[in-house]
Each structure stands twice: as C-alpha cells, then as structure tokens.
C-alpha cells in the first residue's frame, strides 16, 4: 500500500466534499450573470418588463464590479427605451456613464440621444450624438448618428418657429 498516494486521495476527496458544503461565491456570481444574460435574451425576445426585472435582480450582486454594473444599467436603459419610459431610460444610461465617464461608449451616447429625441429634447439629443461619434462607432453608425443630428437640428428649428 502506497501511503502517500492514499493520503492524497483522502485529501482530494475531502476538498471535493468541502466545495459541495460551502459553495464558492463564483456559483453565486454565475447565478447573477445568468440573470443578466436572461435579461439580454428577454430584450431580444421583446419581453422588456421581464428583462428589466432580471437586470434589477442581477444589479445588487455586482456592486464591486464596475464593468458589470455598467452593462446592467445599459441593459436597463434599453429595456426602459422599448417600454417607452424615456426619462427612466436616460437616467439608467446616465448612471452607467457616471461610473467611468472616460470609458463611455458611443453606442450608449447614441441610445441616450435617441431617448432624448423621443422626449422632444432635441438639443440634448444633438449633444449626445455629437459626443458619440468619436467613441468607437462604426462607419455606418457614424453615418446614422450624423443623420440623427441633421434631423434633430431640423426639429429644433421647427420648435423655435412654434414657440414664437
């Protein structure tokens, strides 16, 4: 009988048993990531209220993970947009941007600009669209963003005519 081998087997078996008795925080994190992933899938399926609920369940567990908080808040913003709750949409995007302002992506600013435009806050929309352009948009996205700026500027002129 090889005592060293037997001792290693006992030790490895006890570590396996220990893992089952005390689940690591990774399993909890995986559960929360699955809430986030489910929220994304529900948005793609057009179930926006359910998606929002999933993002809300995932959010508290990632208080120390800025990247995940930003993703979740952006997901919430997207869900609110599709629910046509534009003020809450803008608020979610804004909260995400405050976490790491220097890393805000163009797509987030574009989405925020679109929500502002839906609320007829065209000047705020233009500011978002202009800031989005140098922040990692593709050529097609830049073209679409410039089209949005042009449309909003036309609508700003129309608003000014109405208010005279």
Predicted ranges, named:
Residues 117-140, 147-154:
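TPR/TPR-like (Sel1-like) alpha-helical repeat modules
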């Amino acid at each position: 009988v090889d005592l060293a081998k037997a001792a290693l087997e006992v030790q490895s078996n006890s570590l396996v048993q220990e893992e089952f008795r005390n689940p690591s925080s990774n399993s909890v994190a995986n559960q929360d990531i699955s809430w986030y992933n489910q929220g994304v899938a529900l948005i793609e399926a057009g179930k926006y209220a359910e998606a929002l609920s999933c993002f809300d369940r995932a959010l508290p567990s990632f208080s120390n993970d800025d990247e995940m908080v930003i993703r979740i808040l952006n997901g919430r913003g997207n869900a609110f947009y599709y629910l046509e709750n534009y003020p809450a949409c803008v608020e979610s995007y804004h909260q995400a941007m405050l976490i790491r302002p220097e890393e805000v992506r163009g797509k987030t600013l574009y989405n925020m600009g679109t929500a502002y435009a839906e609320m007829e806050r065209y000047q705020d929309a233009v500011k978002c669209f202009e800031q989005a352009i140098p922040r990692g948009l593709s050529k097609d996205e830049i073209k679409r963003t410039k089209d949005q700026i042009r449309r909003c500027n036309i609508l700003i002129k129309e608003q000014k005519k109405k208010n005279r």
